Structures are given as structure tokens and as C-alpha cells.
């Protein structure tokens, strides 16, 4: 039970790290760059993707077509104020975002950001392991499981931790390759 719970939490950490990686620009247009953009729609922060169709007609352009034409200006303002680092171009019916090629300094910055996200994922996995080990030790102390069972569960937990940490490392290597490929 403890191992299954830890496994699902570790899987969530890997998925969270993957989502964080998706927000990092790689020099190619990707609609997920706008996932964190919230638009002030009638006083409430609303995700951009629920107000507009977002597409990538080519490798260097993101096209945003609002479902309602009157939301063009507030969408443009939200993108300008967000931290995506792209300047919107409003032509009256759609908003275009041109993705400039990344400079080598910008690529290094994005690799650092990816490394930071990966480390946060690894720390989360280690914290899950620590909490699970505490639970196993409590069971052992309460004589619910034997010392051998406790040791086996802790060994299995360490194997799980290694597996999920290596998944994050693989995701990081893939993201670094994406970022550094010109």
C-alpha cells in the first residue's frame, strides 16, 4: 500500500516536471508556451486556451484565434504582461506570435531553467521516499510488519526512487538536446 502510494506520487512528480519543461522555449513554435497565460476575462483570470484556438502554422509562428472577437485586445494585453517573452501582433482578427531564433546565451539560460525544474522534481521524489520510509518504520515500530519486511519494502522503495529519478534525468537530457539543437 505504501509502495503503491509512493509510486503514484512519484509518477505525478515526473509528469509535473514534464509540464514545467513544456513551458520552456526551444526555438520552435509550440502552443504549450502559452499554457500559463491567464486572461482577465470579465474580472476573472481565465486560461488563454479556453478563450481562443491556438495553432502553430509553421515552426516560427503561433496563431491565436479568439472565439469572440471582442477578446482580442485583452488577450494581446495578457500575452504582453506574461513572462513568455514574446510580442503579440494583432491584425484585427487573429494574434500572431513570431518566435525569434534563440541566441546562445538564451539557450544556456533555458538549459539552466530546465536543470532547475529537474532538480525540483528529484527533490520531490526524494521527499516522497522519505515520507514512505517514515511510514514503513512506524509500521515496524508498531509491530505491524517484521524487520525483514521493513527492509524489503525500503529496498523496493529505493529501486522505485532510482527509477523515477532516472526518468527525470532522461527528460532533462531530451529537453537539453531540444534547446541546444539549432
Swiss-Prot record:
Organism: Nostoc punctiforme (strain ATCC 29133 / PCC 73102)
Job of this protein: Responsible for the release of ribosomes from messenger RNA at the termination of protein biosynthesis. May increase the efficiency of translation by recycling ribosomes from one round of translation to another.
This protein's UniProt keywords: Cytoplasm, Protein biosynthesis
The family this protein is said to belong to: Belongs to the RRF family.
Superkingdom, taxonomy of origin: Bacteria
Subcellular location: Cytoplasm
HAMAP family: RRF
Pfam family, one: RRF
GO MF assignments: ribosomal large subunit binding
CDD domains: RRF (cd00520)
Presence of the UniProt keyword Protein biosynthesis in the record: yes
Family annotation (Gene3D superfamilies): 3.30.1360.40, Ribosome-recycling factor
GO biological process: translational termination
GO cellular component, one term: cytoplasm
Protein name: Ribosome-recycling factor
InterPro entries: Ribosome_recyc_fac (IPR002661), Ribosome_recyc_fac_dom (IPR023584), RRF_sf (IPR036191)
Main location: cytoplasm
Amino acid at each position: 500500500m505504501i509502495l503503491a502510494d509512493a509510486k503514484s506520487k512519484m509518477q505525478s512528480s515526473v509528469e509535473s516536471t514534464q509540464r514545467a519543461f513544456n513551458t520552456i522555449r526551444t526555438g520552435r513554435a509550440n502552443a504549450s508556451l502559452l499554457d500559463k497565460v491567464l486572461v482577465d476575462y470579465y474580472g476573472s483570470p481565465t486560461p488563454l486556451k479556453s478563450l481562443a484556438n491556438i495553432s502553430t502554422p509553421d515552426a516560427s509562428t503561433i496563431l491565436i484565434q479568439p472565439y469572440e472577437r471582442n477578446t482580442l485586445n485583452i488577450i494581446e494585453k495578457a500575452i504582453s504582461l506574461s513572462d513568455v517573452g514574446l510580442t503579440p501582433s494583432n491584425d484585427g482578427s487573429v494574434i500572431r506570435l513570431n518566435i525569434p531564433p534563440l541566441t546562445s546565451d538564451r539557450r544556456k539560460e533555458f538549459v539552466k531553467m530546465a536543470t532547475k525544474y529537474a532538480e525540483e522534481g528529484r527533490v520531490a521524489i526524494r521527499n516522497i521516499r522519505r515520507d514512505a520510509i517514515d511510514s514503513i518504520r512506524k509500521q515496524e515500530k508498531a509491530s505491524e510488519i517484521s524487520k525483514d519486511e521493513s527492509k524489503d519494502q525500503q529496498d523496493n522503495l529505493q529501486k522505485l526512487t532510482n527509477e523515477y529519478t532516472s526518468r527525470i534525468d532522461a527528460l532533462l537530457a531530451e529537453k537539453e538536446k531540444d534547446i541546444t539543437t539549432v
